[in-house]
């Protein structure tokens, strides 16, 4: 199930002045260009009610089935999870790798992620495993694939959740009035995840906060831009443990000293796993 949520920002310028005995199987999508010198970095995140742990892994130059990735860093208690390649596919539909550089193709690895007993002892739902791949070519071209997810917990319904401009109530539109200066005027607006009309606070390290982080992690976000050339917005994603989803940095070129009305649109899709 998916729920589509739209947020609008109207910018107005005034021109006056169970236990986890088995491993998780995760399909990780990646981009490739046939250059064996590319460097692959794999990012792993494990989210649970009491904590969020992140790790970085790398492979040998020629990643082969059966290889266990080398752990570079891990923020949780030792040992770091074991990540083993159990299969791969190439030349799949490029739609699975959004934003591919020109001339690159799309594929996916299937990894088995085995979590240590010490972390498993804290296991309770919501529990989510997230993994992605980042490829860097010698020529300086980089591509980070989409997040892949796995869990053994029941699906989380997104029906009670929404996205808002205000952390105190659900607000789908925002009127921003700015004063012209003859230069560039900048303003930052934040968005929030809501549940049943109230703030869903991902800073809480408990079951309630865990479900907020789960839903926030599964969001697909698109900025559709603004309908006037003088207005631009840069969305900055907050860490998953913050209560904000994005900071929208709005910039308005007021050099013309003329009134400007512009609408900026942002799409949030709340996905279920």
Curated annotation (Swiss-Prot):
Disruption phenotype: Deletion of the operon under classical laboratory conditions does not result in any major effect on E.coli capacity to form biofilms compared with the wild-type strain. It comes from the Bacteria. It holds the Pfam family DUF2544. Induction: Expression is negatively regulated by H-NS and subjected to cAMP receptor protein (CRP)-mediated catabolite repression. The keyword Glycosyltransferase does not apply. Residues 1-21 form the signal peptide. The keyword Transferase does not apply. Keywords: Signal. One of its GO terms (cellular component) is cytosol. InterPro entries: DUF2544 (IPR021407). To S.typhimurium YadU. The operon is cryptic under classical laboratory conditions, but is functional when constitutively expressed. Part of the yfcOPQRSUV fimbrial operon. Could contribute to adhesion to various surfaces in specific environmental niches. Increases adhesion to eukaryotic T24 bladder epithelial cells in the absence of fim genes. This is Uncharacterized protein YfcO. It comes from Escherichia coli (strain K12).
């Amino acid at each position: 199930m998916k729920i589509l949520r739209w947020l609008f920002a109207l910018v107005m310028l005034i021109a006056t002045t169970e236990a986890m005995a088995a491993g998780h199987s995760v399909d990780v999508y990646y981009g490739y260009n046939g250059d064996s010198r590319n460097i692959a970095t794999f990012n792993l995140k494990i989210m649970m009610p009491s904590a969020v742990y992140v790790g970085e892994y790398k492979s040998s130059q020629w990643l082969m089935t059966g290889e266990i990735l080398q752990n570079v860093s891990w923020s949780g208690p030792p040992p770091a999870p074991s990540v083993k390649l159990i299969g791969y596919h190439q030349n799949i539909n490029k739609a699975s790798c959004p934003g591919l550089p020109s001339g690159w193709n799309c594929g996916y690895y299937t990894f088995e992620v085995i979590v240590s007993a010490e972390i498993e002892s804290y296991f309770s739902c919501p529990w989510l495993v997230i993994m992605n791949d980042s490829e860097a070519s010698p020529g300086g071209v980089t591509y980070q694939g989409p997040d892949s997810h796995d869990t053994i917990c029941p699906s989380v319904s997104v029906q009670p959740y929404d996205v808002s401009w205000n952390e105190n109530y659900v607000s789908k539109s925002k009127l921003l009035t700015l004063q012209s200066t003859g230069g560039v005027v900048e303003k930052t607006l934040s968005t929030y995840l809501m549940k049943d009309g109230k703030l869903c606070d991902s800073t809480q390290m408990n079951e309630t906060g865990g479900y907020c982080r789960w839903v926030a992690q599964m969001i697909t976000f698109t900025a559709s831009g603004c309908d006037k050339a003088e207005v631009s917005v840069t969305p900055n994603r907050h860490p998953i443990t913050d209560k904000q989803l994005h900071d929208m940095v709005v910039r308005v070129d007021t050099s013309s000293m003329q009134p400007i009305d512009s609408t900026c649109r942002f799409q949030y899709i709340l996905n279920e796993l």
